[in-house]
Amino acid sequence: MRRTQMNLTNETFSKALDDNKVLIVDFWADWCGPCLKVAPILDEIANEYNVTFAKVHVDEEQDLAYKYDVSTIPTLLVFENGLPVKRVVGAQPKHKLVKEFEGWI
């Protein structure tokens, strides 16, 4: 099991995709209540499964949010081999997120 939580910027995003076969990216903001609610759940999943999570603060990295069509937060994007393959929008309980991520965790 590995637990990695990276804060990504426009400058570090591509390298993170290149360095991880599967990367789950949490697009969030510190003023977003549902984002704060889901954060500890993502920490639990990262600790229990073989998955790397990263965070993108949408206020600070608006270009990335725009590029990946993130208009609602939290939005979780699963990237596989550098490509977005799954989108989960909104805070969800742990068991639902685990089910959404099946095949990647």
Model-predicted regions and their roles:
Residues 1-18:
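N-terminal "domain-start" segment that seeds a small globular fold
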Residues 4-6, 54, 85-88:
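Structural signal for short hydrophobic segments within the conserved structured cores
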Residues 32-35:
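Hydrophobic heptad-repeat coiled-coil signature
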Residues 23, 50-52, 81:
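Structural signature of beta-strand start/N-cap positions in the alpha/beta core
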